[in-house]
């Protein structure tokens, strides 16, 4: 086992604090509308330029192992805030730094670390309640646009495109961000349900120019088994041919004689038909087939419930306005499903999400919910250079997470004002003893830090602005973008409640662990074993080899 280095008490805390401050000082320069860029060197390719706090935090590794432990713990704050709310990483880092700095001063003055931590925790619980009380629900597109704009570092075009995407596919719809080919941002919306399964045979293609299958007003047959015998499909094919409509078959698989016969019928024009595999596997496939059935007012043909494929009638088939099938995807547009049935299915999936304890299951259920609740929107990022593209894509993804968080829990006044008001709301809170009360005051002072940092990044005087904001009420605050005071909500400066809440909770949690640290252990540096052995004696010995040539 490798030897270890151990530090105790104040020596350990001083080293840890140095690491905390190095990381936090690099991250906090990005905060606010006038936050600065950070340039990160990469071992390959050009440097990255970013204003994203978590990107900066993830790049920092310190040489001193004790200092690095402090830096990594603050990095954890940024990562947790990012995972929970998708934004607020810089705010969380600034809060953690403030709590650790204030707390360690108190410990150095002789206060009990455990009571200090209890006081901080008590203050945070009360502050979170105050934040929730001041939260305003997001009901209109304008608020979504404002949240997106603020999160994307005051880029109004980003706010607008996210608001438009949410308007088109719904707040629970699928919105993806990808790199585009143009200089400007573009929004591509796919109305309806899309899943990752393409046509089973290229002979189904009827749009040669783009290599897709397009079916207008098709019947949709949903089967929860493999189809290899064409006899099972004859009744359905005859009924569809008489109705004069195309047919889409979605089954576990279509193979052998059945697939060959479908291809021949399609090429001869007897029945316009296409077949795709059902999405997912096992129980998830069954559930997704049922989702499609709900969307298209069809029935899943399953032998488990006693239904036979040979006895299918046109009433069992689903219908949609249009279906587009490519090599890899199937899009069902405008299914004729009853709205009440679709909403009931959506509610059922929401219930399953709440009951599920697996992150993977939750993610898959969320995908199903999005497919049913709305279409799919793709935001294509435009930029002049690859470096700008990557920086902008990161900002748009942050803004998208922030707007989702805003829809979930509402919004509060931005610019650090909500935390100032929450701090004012808990100023009379007292702990069980003097040290706990001091811990509450540590948290209250730390909650001023984000506003102070935003103002400092603008080049203004933090204390002057803080006093002015303190003297105001409600949403009155400081607009760092143009150095004016006013109602933050009316000026469109909003923060999602979830982002502010998560930043405060995670910062206090990790800072509390640091304050109660009494020892730090790390691997001792490996001492150099010395240089290469002396080989000078080999010269003479090898000289005798000359006679062998």
Curated annotation (Swiss-Prot):
- Extract one GO molecular function annotation from the record: unfolded protein binding
What biological-process GO terms show up in the record? protein refolding
- The residues listed in the UniProt record as binding ATP, with positions renumbered to this chain, are 30-33, 51, 87-91, 415, 495
| Primary enzyme class | isomerase
Q: Which UniProt keywords apply?
A: ATP-binding, Chaperone, Cytoplasm, Isomerase, Nucleotide-binding
Q: What catalytic reaction does the record list?
A: ATP + H2O + a folded polypeptide = ADP + phosphate + an unfolded polypeptide
- EC numbers on record: 5.6.1.7
User: What Gene3D superfamilies does the annotation carry?
Assistant: GroEL, GroEL-like equatorial domain, TCP-1-like chaperonin intermediate domain
Which Cys pairs does UniProt list as disulfide-bonded? none
Record-linked Pfam families: Cpn60_TCP1
Q: Which domain of life is it from?
A: Bacteria
Q: What is its main location?
A: cytoplasm
InterPro entries in the record: Chaperonin_Cpn60_CS, Cpn60/GroEL, Cpn60/GroEL/TCP-1, GroEL-like_apical_dom_sf, GROEL-like_equatorial_sf, TCP-1-like_intermed_sf
* Known partners and oligomeric status: Forms a cylinder of 14 subunits composed of two heptameric rings stacked back-to-back. Interacts with the co-chaperonin GroES.
Q: What does this protein do?
A: Together with its co-chaperonin GroES, plays an essential role in assisting protein folding. The GroEL-GroES system forms a nano-cage that allows encapsulation of the non-native substrate proteins and provides a physical environment optimized to promote and accelerate protein folding.
- Give the family per the record: Belongs to the chaperonin (HSP60) family.
This chain belongs to which protein, by name?
Chaperonin GroEL
| Species the sequence originates in | Colwellia maris
């Amino acid at each position: 086992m490798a030897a270890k280095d151990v530090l105790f008490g104040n020596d350990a805390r001083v080293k840890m604090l140095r690491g905390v401050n190095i990381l936090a000082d690099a991250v906090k320069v990005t905060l606010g509308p006038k936050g600065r860029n950070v340039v990160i060197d990469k071992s390959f390719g050009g440097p990255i330029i970013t204003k994203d706090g978590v990107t900066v935090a993830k790049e920092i590794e310190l040489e001193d192992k004790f200092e690095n432990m402090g830096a990594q713990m603050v990095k954890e704050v940024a990562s947790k805030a990012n995972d929970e709310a998708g934004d607020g990483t810089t705010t969380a880092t600034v809060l953690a730094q403030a709590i650790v700095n204030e707390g360690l001063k108190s410990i150095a003055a002789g206060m009990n670390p455990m009571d200090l931590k209890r006081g901080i925790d008590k203050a945070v619980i009360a502050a979170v309640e105050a934040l929730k009380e001041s939260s305003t629900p997001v009901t209109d597109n304008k608020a979504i646009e404002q949240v997106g704009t603020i999160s994307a570092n005051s880029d109004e075009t980003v706010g607008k495109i996210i608001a438009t995407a949410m308007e088109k596919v719904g707040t629970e719809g699928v919105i993806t961000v990808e790199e585009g080919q143009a200089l400007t941002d573009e929004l591509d919306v796919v109305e309806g349900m899309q899943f990752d399964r393409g046509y089973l045979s290229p002979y189904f293609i009827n749009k040669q120019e783009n290599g897709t299958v397009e079916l207008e007003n098709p019947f949709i047959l949903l089967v929860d088994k493999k189809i290899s015998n064409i006899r099972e499909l004859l009744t359905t094919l005859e009924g569809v041919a008489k109705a004069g409509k195309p047919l889409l078959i979605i089954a576990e698989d279509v193979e052998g004689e059945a697939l060959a016969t479908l291809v021949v019928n399609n090429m001869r024009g007897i029945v316009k038909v296409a077949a795709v595999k059902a999405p997912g596997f096992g129980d998830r496939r069954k559930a997704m087939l049922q989702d499609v059935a709900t969307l298209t007012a069809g029935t899943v043909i399953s032998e488990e419930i006693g239904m036979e494929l040979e006895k299918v009638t046109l009433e069992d088939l689903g219908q949609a306005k249009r279906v587009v099938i490519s090599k890899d995807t199937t899009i069902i547009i405008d299914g004729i499903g009853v709205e009440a049935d679709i909403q009931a299915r959506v509610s059922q999936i929401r219930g399953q999400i709440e009951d599920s304890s697996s992150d993977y299951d939750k993610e898959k259920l969320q995908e199903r919910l999005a497919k049913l609740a709305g279409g799919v929107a793709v935001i294509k990022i435009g930029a002049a250079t690859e470096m700008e593209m990557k920086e902008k894509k990161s900002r748009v993804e942050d803004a998208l997470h922030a707007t989702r968080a805003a829809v979930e829990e509402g919004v509060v006044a931005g610019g650090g004002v909500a935390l100032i008001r929450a701090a004012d709301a808990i100023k009379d809170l007292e702990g069980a003893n003097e040290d706990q009360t001091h811990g509450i005051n540590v948290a209250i002072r730390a909650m001023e830090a984000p506003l102070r940092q935003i103002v400092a990044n603008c080049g203004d005087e933090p204390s002057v602005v803080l006093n002015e904001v303190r003297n105001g009420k409600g949403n009155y605050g400081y607009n760092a973008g143009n150095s004016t005071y006013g109602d933050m909500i009316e000026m469109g400066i909003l923060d999602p409640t979830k982002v502010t809440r998560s930043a405060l909770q995670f910062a206090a949690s990790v800072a509390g662990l640091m304050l109660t640290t009494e020892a730090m252990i790390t691997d001792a540096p490996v001492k150099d074993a010395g240089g290469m052995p002396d080989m000078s004696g080999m010269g003479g010995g090898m000289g005798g080899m000359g006679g062998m040539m």
